[in-house]
Amino acid sequence: MAQIKITLSKSPIGRKPEQRKTVAALGLGKLNSSVVKEDNAAIRGMVNAVSHLVTVEDVK
């Protein structure tokens, strides 16, 4: 299955609690931290909810 790299590019400080929890659930803590996750519908939905805070790249 394909994988995606998710990087926290903007701070969740001052955002809604749901968005902060989503960032934490993705495994992102500090600014510019990155995680590699499987590309599935659940992860894509979480990324879509905080798309203004993260950047996404395909991993080959």
Curated annotation (Swiss-Prot):
This one is known as Large ribosomal subunit protein uL30
An example of a Pfam family matching this protein is: Ribosomal_L30
Q: Which family does it belong to?
A: Belongs to the universal ribosomal protein uL30 family.
Please tell me whether the keyword Chaperone is annotated for this protein. no
Assembly and interaction partners: Part of the 50S ribosomal subunit.
Q: Name one GO biological process term.
A: translation
**UniProt source species:** Streptococcus thermophilus (strain ATCC BAA-250 / LMG 18311)
Q: Which residues form the signal peptide?
A: none
Q: Print the keywords alphabetically.
A: Ribonucleoprotein, Ribosomal protein
The answer to keyword S-adenosyl-L-methionine applying to this record is no
Gene Ontology annotations for the cellular component aspect, listed alphabetically = cytosolic large ribosomal subunit
Residues that span the membrane, as ranges: none
- Superkingdom of the organism of origin: Bacteria
Any idea which GO molecular function terms this record carries? structural constituent of ribosome
